């Protein structure tokens, strides 16, 4: 939320390590679903190549708060094929629940929009 490029890089490296632990654990199992998704996008980070060859990349921000950009969904394991690359966040817990045998969400909680089936 602070539009801090250094923190973006260090946090993403730590996040990558954590996700790899989860993926390694789930690898070869049929009872573990790994879902990686953000609750929102913040800042509208943009990366350019700099002004000349050999210069560092430049970063910029288009906003200081949440943006309307969709968030990506990455998943592996049971029912992961039901999770699209982008979808309404409200559908994700419903799809995860399918792995627990929950199929009746009630009429007000049915899957809707992109990613619905």
Where are these regions (language model features)?
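A post-motif C-terminal structural segment
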Residues: 1-117
